[in-house]
UniProtKB/Swiss-Prot annotation:
This is Glutamyl-tRNA(Gln) amidotransferase subunit A. The lineage of its organism: Bacteria, Pseudomonadati, Pseudomonadota, Betaproteobacteria, Burkholderiales. InterPro entries: Amidase (IPR000120), Amidase_CS (IPR020556), Amidase_dom (IPR023631), AS_sf (IPR036928), GatA (IPR004412). GO terms for biological process: translation. Pfam families: Amidase (PF01425). It comes from Herminiimonas arsenicoxydans. The gene is gatA.
Amino acid sequence: MHTKTIKELSALLQTKKISATELAQLFLKRMGASDLNAFLHVDEALTLQQAAAADQRIASGNAGVLTGIPIAHKDIFVTRNWRSTAGSKMLENYVSPFDATVVENFNQAGMVTLGKLNCDEFAMGSSNENSYFGAVKNPWDKTAIPGGSSGGSAAAIAARLTPASTATDTGGSIRQPAALCGVTGIKPTYGRVSRFGMIAFASSLDQGGPIAKTAEDCGLLLNAMVSFDERDSTSVERDKEDFTRDLNAPLEGLKIGIPREYFGAGLSADVEQAVRAALGEYEKLGATLVDISLPKTELSIPTYYVIAPAEASSNLSRFDGVRYGFRAKDYTDLSDMYCKTRAEGFGEEVKRRILVGAYVLSHGYYDAYYLQAQKIRRLIAQDFQQAFTLCDVIMGPVAPSVAWDLGDKADDPVANYLADIFTLSTSLAGLPGMSIPCGFGQGEKNAKRPVGLQIIGNYFAEAKLLNVAHQYQQATDWHLRQPAE
């Protein structure tokens, strides 16, 4: 039962072959037996209460596709009934007075919350080793990182601990862990998914999205996740659409752009081989490969690491120990309380980014760094628009290598940052991008570590991306493979 897709589980629920309560119990049991550290907060009584309500809804005949389907939320989305910690000591015991819009949308659809998922602290990281609550292990190889910052979200799907999870992507935090855990994830166009109740890291980049087993499942989840929200000033108002509408469209005549900058010196040979094999599969499906250039790709890392920390230093100034969250025990006056609270409450990586952000926003440096970065960001977006005159979608690797060993890059933040080279530019441009599994690494160690293929589309082209991904998943079985129990 735990290996079935959302679509399959939905059919079983609607025909009453299984109840939402039985399904929830099954996944709660699997979660309890797992040693991946993917889940942070679980409340079985609350989960079973939601499941019973879903069963009633199904019995009364007003259930939707997602009614009764279990889901787990990245601990960046605030929840009224579960703790919302953002993976930080700063919010260790925080319980929100309201639900994030994304959580609200899924509750209204009748989904059953299994709990909150581990992530890098305040979503800052590429390996899920920056969580105050400990690292998450990759289910394919427990000595490897799962990717980040949504490591718990991807690991829980790969280990079949939940059929659906929410995640957030600021510079690659949906796509990179999805790739390294061999599952499917999509970051929608910026503004598609409400950020209300999503603990902010970098407000002009943060975007929520789903991680699941298949592209079809991601489409079903997006149907509920995407909504206009007046409480989020960056929310985009568009007509409601069915993201699964084009899944079965043939790919004959599709033009796939292959950026030459994504296949350079930094890309490991086994990742390149898996990605090129996937591109060959697309040619068999009737697509044409087109050589394109995204010349500002290498500038995406310095640009991102000016803009994101600048916004983070501003966003995280609200955590001062006064109204909520952690407060230092011993202090002499207000100023001392602020200093000690933030010194003790934030982890090393978060403090590093706050310092960088404060520096680039400071007098005398703002023009030299922040303003320049915003100009380059615009040029990166223009590169993509130029490319889309030649092709329909863009494809390449998600990450330059398969997952590395836990602790391997712990002392080298820059090496961690470089893992996002292929995902950052999409985020800076605000474009939709997704990751689908397309193979494994090579050699004794890497042969069990997955590789992801990245598919990037133009603004609001999520249905197109899901179609392109779904057609590949109809022709291959990478998405069906699962780690040994």
